[in-house]
A protein has these predicted regions:
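Helical scaffold of the NTase/Pol beta-like nucleotidyltransferase catalytic core
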Residues: 1-26
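Conserved NTP/Mg2+-binding pocket subregion across the NTase superfamily
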Residues: 3, 7, 57-148
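Conserved nucleotidyltransferase catalytic core and NTase-mimicking acidic/glycine-rich helix/loop elements
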Residues: 9, 104, 110-205
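Short, flexible, glycine/charge-rich loop motifs used to bind or transfer phosphoryl groups or to couple energy/partner
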Residues: 16-17, 34-36, 141
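A generic fold-level signal
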Residues: 21, 38-40, 86
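Secondary-structure boundary/capping positions in well-ordered alpha/beta enzyme cores
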Residues: 22, 70-71, 181
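Catalytic metal-binding acidic patch
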Residues: 30-62, 74-76
């Protein structure tokens, strides 16, 4: 597995060389950000520049080509203004799930309201519902099913926050504080993530 601390040092050095004095925020999302990475985990880097042009995207792409494990690097690249004008319901978990390396997303997160969080939950739940029905009827894909459980886990994070005002970032902690029916969904997601077999019909239900 990647030694993430060493990787980040190399990454930030390359980023500063590519964009001197232009990095407003840099952070780490996903499994590595939560300390839940496996051998198959991507490295989800978040970079917010002072502004972003097509030329900047090409520069960033060339920068990534100089780094180890290029095939594992993914994430989010944006300009500051674009992020500040993003759909607020998407910013809730985007900000909460990002471990800062440089800068802060607190200003962005402060614009998110309880109505935005409710919209994120509803939109996420609708997406999971439609995805499950579509997959059972047409795709019949275990990979899609696993992705739906991942999406459901983020919905449950938001639901718990809406109920309690507490954002539980780590799934292993969240599973113990959810009601039994919701906890079972999260437990299944964690088993699938750790290499467990997908039982298509039962897990689709």
């Amino acid at each position: 597995m990647i030694e993430i601390t060493e990787f980040i040092k190399k990454y930030m050095t390359a980023l500063d060389q590519a964009f001197p004095d232009r990095v407003w925020f840099a952070g780490l999302q996903g499994s590595y950000g939560r300390g839940e990475a496996t051998e198959a985990s991507d490295i989800d880097m978040v970079v917010i520049l002072d502004q972003l042009s097509a030329s900047d995207i090409r520069t960033y792409d060339a920068m990534l080509d100089t780094l180890p494990c290029r095939e594992l690097i993914c994430g989010f690249l944006s300009g500051r203004q674009e992020l500040e004008n993003w759909e607020p319901s998407e910013l809730f978990q985007f900000c909460r799930d990002t471990t800062p390396i440089r800068g802060s997303l607190d200003q962005v997160l402060s614009s998110v309201t309880s109505a935005d969080i409710a919209r994120a939950i509803k939109s996420g739940a609708c997406g999971v519902y439609h995805g499950c029905v579509h997959n059972m009827l047409y795709e019949k894909s275990e990979d899609i099913l696993k992705g739906l459980y991942k999406s459901a886990s983020f919905v449950l994070q938001a639901v718990h926050f809406q109920r309690t005002g507490v954002y539980v970032r780590h799934m292993a902690d969240l599973v113990s504080v959810l009601p039994p029916e919701e906890s079972a969904v999260l437990q299944t997601f964690m088993e699938l993530k750790n290499g467990g077999a997908a039982v298509f019909d039962a897990m689709s239900e």
